[in-house]
């Protein structure tokens, strides 16, 4: 019995040591695993298909969020000229996948807020909001940590 327990412990230790990416305390269906799985999928899509129009996005993002973003896309109303989920125009998916760092989550009522960082030199910090939808964790909103940009650039001469 002791040998069995030692083997299980050793196997678990090896598995955890070999696990790539960010060490997060997460269950198979947790806010953290949803966010990590989403960005892994999203960044690996590259130019093959526009992720917002891919039906797989519903596996990670809440239906009302996707539907509103798709409507904005159809009517050319997506804000800021940057990707909604990355908040930048150009990225290197390989670097972003390697540097993806999930920070400790904060639960506020039924919503979980997860800070997320990408990049090497100039880092991109995001705040991802996740809530339950039909029993599964889904992303409801993504914000960056830069100051308010508005819909136009501030002109002090205005």
Question: Residues of each region from the PLM?
Answer:
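Low-complexity, intrinsically disordered terminal/linker segments enriched in charged
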Residues: 106-115, 120-127, 133-134, 139-158
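C-terminal segment of classical bacterial N-terminal signal peptides
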Residues: 14-23
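Surface-exposed, charged secondary-structure patches
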Residues: 26, 61-122
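Extracytoplasmic/periplasmic, Sec-exported soluble proteins
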Residues: 26-31, 49, 118, 122, ...
